[in-house]
Amino acid sequence: MQHIRNFSIIAHIDHGKSTLADRIIHLCGGLSDREMEEQVLDSMELERERGITIKAQTAALEYKSRDGSSYLLNLIDTPGHVDFSYEVSRSLAACEGALLVVDASQGVEAQTVANCYTAIEQGVEVIPVLNKIDLPAAEPERVIKEIEDIIGIEAQDAVRASAKTGVGVEDILEAVISRIPPPKGNPEAPLKALIIDSWFDNYVGVVMLVRVMDGVLKPKDRILLMASKTTHLCEQVGVFTPKSRNRESLSAGEVGFIISGIKELKSAKVGDTVTLVDRPAPQPLLGFKEIKPQVFAGLYPVESNQYDALRDALEKLKLNDSSLQYEPETSQALGFGFRCGFLGLLHLDIVQERLEREYDMNLITTAPTVVYQVVLRDGSVIEIENPSRLPDLSKIEQIREPIITATILVPQEYVGSVITLCISKRGIQKNMQYMGRQVMLTYEIPLNEVVMDFFDRLKSTSRGYASLDYEFKEFRASDLVKLDILINGERVDALSLIVHRASSQYRGRELAQKMRELIPRQMFDIAVQAAIGSHIIARESIKALRKNVLAKCYGGDITRKRKLLEKQKAGKKRMKQVGNVEIPQEAFLAILQVGEK
């Protein structure tokens, strides 16, 4: 065990984490030159294309150090995006050390800080690495000072490397061996293994990626999953060197996979503890929590006969993504579809893109909403994720909305505009720290203000320099109302919103105007109204298209013309009674753009 090192790589998006992982694997001979391809550990096509890591992956590598002894290095690749922060914390719990990779030209970003704090809280040894040192814009001295100021760890002896050219990669591995402690664990104790990740394989069922803390696991052992309380027969164990290799056992300190014929991912939750049935561990490992979706949206097939295909596609995606939740729902405007829950906006985006790309779906997505807690007059509390399901206002005591703590890192020259943005989103400033050229702002902001367009606007007000990290804080009572859109007097459930009373008038007017621009003109007049309860706060009319019925009249009596106009008017009136209005997809997305000005 003295010769095992478990480490992961923490980095912000685009700071070169996956490239560095590729280099390390290549250097240790995990893959031959022919098999090397960009981003080896990002096995999903979408991960490669967006250049982000979504699922955690591992590689067990053998490395011969400069002093001649050989070591087993377990590299655990973690997602870097804020939506997947729980997966990051589990990956870090499986390690003794972490490489903090910072781009030498860009400096420290908010997500790096958040993940680094997670690592320090879990007592993981952090080694700073300056990547992209070969760039002409690299400023190692400034970035070292930033790491020390913002994160507060010693960074003078940070390893300087360039994953692209391969410079300094060996120094990184030497630092891993000298500075990261070997795993502690007792091979004699009852088995305890932490599930870092799990995914579904078409041939063998669920594959669990685990870090064995204590004990030994062999094939043919009966295992117990402590959080889901299910037992299974362990069929095979092994390690990834990115390719899978079977082994005869996994013992304390090692990272590998377990296959035990589990059919669904619900049983193998990330962060759960695996132990043996006949000799169970007294208590599970700390830190397990159920992942709760934060953002909800409706997904509807454009063709209603694709409903079954969409259900199958969601089922398949759920096999590999236990945090995705969905339930069937119907909407008068959009027909049959599903209400889906996601970890965050990136997660929603990825799921939608995978449905469209891998399953050829044509989807309409409604505006994302968040979960509200509604306290009723009789004292009971219900949770609502769809605005159209809000009970009658007379029954509601108060509505509580989710509040997040947002940490924003931004260069000094953009602080003013970022603060203005946060205030316009009802943010409350909690802290402001100057660190070198950067400023760290801490705000409490309602989550429903963030899901709309906060991220895009943060990037545009700061010319792309600001970075954001957020975590859920609490539900807090607020003065919220439900805003409905009526088209020809009919409520369109998919367009309902829950908004703050102070901005409801403005939002209603804006939405009605947007709808007027987006709904195509029909043969009859269309009235678009915004309402709060039974109170109409805004109205726009879409004028009818009409034929010039007087074109054939020359001169003649006025009554002749009046007769033709009256006839046309009566026809339009009849049409309006039976006509229904098709609402285009852009109209549903317009909700997102309200309040941009």
Curated annotation (Swiss-Prot):
The EC number(s) this enzyme carries: 3.6.5.n1
Entries under CDD domains matching the protein: EF4_II, EF4_III, LepA, lepA_C
Reactions accelerated catalytically: GTP + H2O = GDP + phosphate + H(+)
Binding site for GTP: D14, H15, G16, K17, S18, T19, N131, K132, I133, D134
Keywords recorded for this protein, A-Z: Cell inner membrane, Cell membrane, GTP-binding, Hydrolase, Membrane, Nucleotide-binding, Protein biosynthesis
Name of the protein this chain belongs to: Elongation factor 4
Protein's gene: lepA
Predominant cellular place of this UniProt entry's protein: membrane
InterPro entries attached to this UniProt entry: EF-4, EFG_III/V, EFG_V-like, EFTu-like_2, G_TR_CS, LepA_C_sf, LepA_CTD, LepA_IV
Organism: Nitrosospira multiformis (strain ATCC 25196 / NCIMB 11849 / C 71)
A GO molecular-function descriptor: guanosine tetraphosphate binding
SMART domains per record: EFG_C (SM00838)
GO biological process entries: positive regulation of translation
Entry's Gene Ontology cellular component terms: plasma membrane
Coiled coil: none
Role of this protein: Required for accurate and efficient protein synthesis under certain stress conditions. May act as a fidelity factor of the translation reaction, by catalyzing a one-codon backward translocation of tRNAs on improperly translocated ribosomes. Back-translocation proceeds from a post-translocation (POST) complex to a pre-translocation (PRE) complex, thus giving elongation factor G a second chance to translocate the tRNAs correctly. Binds to ribosomes in a GTP-dependent manner.
Family affiliation: Belongs to the TRAFAC class translation factor GTPase superfamily. Classic translation factor GTPase family. LepA subfamily.
Residue ranges of every copy of the tr-type G domain listed in the record: 2-184
Places the protein is found: Cell inner membrane
Topology in the lipid bilayer: Peripheral membrane protein
Gene3D superfamilies, per the entry: 3.30.70.240, Elongation factor 4, C-terminal domain, Elongation Factor G (Translational Gtpase), domain 3, P-loop containing nucleotide triphosphate hydrolases, Translation factors
Annotated Pfam families: EFG_C (PF00679), GTP_EFTU (PF00009), GTP_EFTU_D2 (PF03144), LepA_C (PF06421)
